[in-house]
């Protein structure tokens, strides 16, 4: 597993290669920009096998950079497979987008992730908040996706030894 807080070479290269000044981009809040963001919201708001199978490669560019708390990928197909595999332990999943901000081709989406795990009673939702930094190519597809969220809130505390260790560390802080 990697840590998302250390800017490794692949992250720095993707950040440099996706600089907004290197490509045409839509004007702020124009129809094209709104359409880009609506595609992202539609993809994550219906976080189902059918929707992800069909639309991940429509929203992400073929060559893209994706990094979250667990994995790092550089293709839309790898992202699609990762997202589909992530559904296996879940009864249901949803993302609620709270707000977004943009600055010169950089987009920041503030979200709440809600997961209902199969091993818990149905309707027992685990929630976590996060922010995603995105950049888009001139076709309106994602070429850079960096998630910032704390997996201890929702995933690691489901593992007994990790739960105890996290509680101990938080108690010492």
Regions found by a protein language model. Give the residues of each.
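Short, low-complexity N-terminal intrinsically disordered segments enriched in polar/charged residues
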Residues: 1-54, 58
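A beta-strand edge to alpha-helix "cap/lid" segment located at domain peripheries
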Residues: 2-26, 88-94, 101-173
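Generic detector of well-ordered alpha-helical segments enriched in charged/polar residues
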Residues: 34-41, 57, 80, 84, ...
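Hydrophobic alpha-helical core bundles mediating ligand binding, dimerization, or RNAP-core interactions
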Residues: 40-44, 60, 83, 113, ...
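General structural signal for alpha-helix termini and helix-helix connectors
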Residues: 46, 65-66, 118
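A solvent-exposed, acidic/Ser-Thr-rich amphipathic alpha-helical stretch
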Residues: 53-104
């Amino acid at each position: 597993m990697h840590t998302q807080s250390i800017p490794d070479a692949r992250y720095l290269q993707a950040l440099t290669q996706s600089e907004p000044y290197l490509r045409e981009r839509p004007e702020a809040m124009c129809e094209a920009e709104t359409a880009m963001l609506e595609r992202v919201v539609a993809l994550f708001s219906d976080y189902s096998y059918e929707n992800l199978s069909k639309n991940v490669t429509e929203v992400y560019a073929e060559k893209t950079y994706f990094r979250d708390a667990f994995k790092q990928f550089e293709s839309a197909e790898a992202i699609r497979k990762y997202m589909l595999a992530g559904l296996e332990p879940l009864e249901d999943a949803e993302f609620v987008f709270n707000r977004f901000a943009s600055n010169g081709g950089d987009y920041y989406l503030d979200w709440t992730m809600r997961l209902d795990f199969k091993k818990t009673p149905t309707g027992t939702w685990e929630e976590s908040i996060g922010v995603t930094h995105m950049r888009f190519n001139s076709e309106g597809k994602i070429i850079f996706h960096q998630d910032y969220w704390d997996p201890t809130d929702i995933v690691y505390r489901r593992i007994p030894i990790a739960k105890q260790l996290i509680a101990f560390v938080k108690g010492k802080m």
